[in-house]
């Protein structure tokens, strides 16, 4: 590989790194919502897989066991949606170069 080729490749890597950092910042402001019990419990996550809010309808406050199950289901759905959102956003940056890697599922976007 010639020096010019190596320089061009390094420049491309740097540009991709900058684009990925920008995409990660965008993910912080994106939200995904999960709900359970027909909307009785709603959880909101950002693109960094952080739960940022939980809303609970007062009608389920009397049944703690059901409430716990509904919270878990809503949070899991919100995190699944956040993962899909992150994968789509990063795919835009990489142009599909990374294929169908599932590394984002376990990626701690928080640093």
UniProtKB/Swiss-Prot annotation:
Pfam families associated with the record: YbaB_DNA_bd
Location in or out of the cell: Cytoplasm, Nucleoid
Gene Ontology MF term list: DNA binding
Entry keyword set: Cytoplasm, DNA-binding
Record's keyword annotation contains Cytoplasm: yes
One GO location term (cellular component): cytosol
Broad class of where this protein is predominantly found: cytoplasm
InterPro entries: YbaB-like_sf, YbaB/EbfC
Subunit structure: Homodimer.
Family according to the record: Belongs to the YbaB/EbfC family.
Described function: Binds to DNA and alters its conformation. May be involved in regulation of gene expression, nucleoid organization and DNA protection.
Name used for this protein in its record: Nucleoid-associated protein Ctha_1157
Organism: Chloroherpeton thalassium (strain ATCC 35110 / GB-78)
UniProt lineage: Bacteria, Pseudomonadati, Chlorobiota, Chlorobiia, Chlorobiales
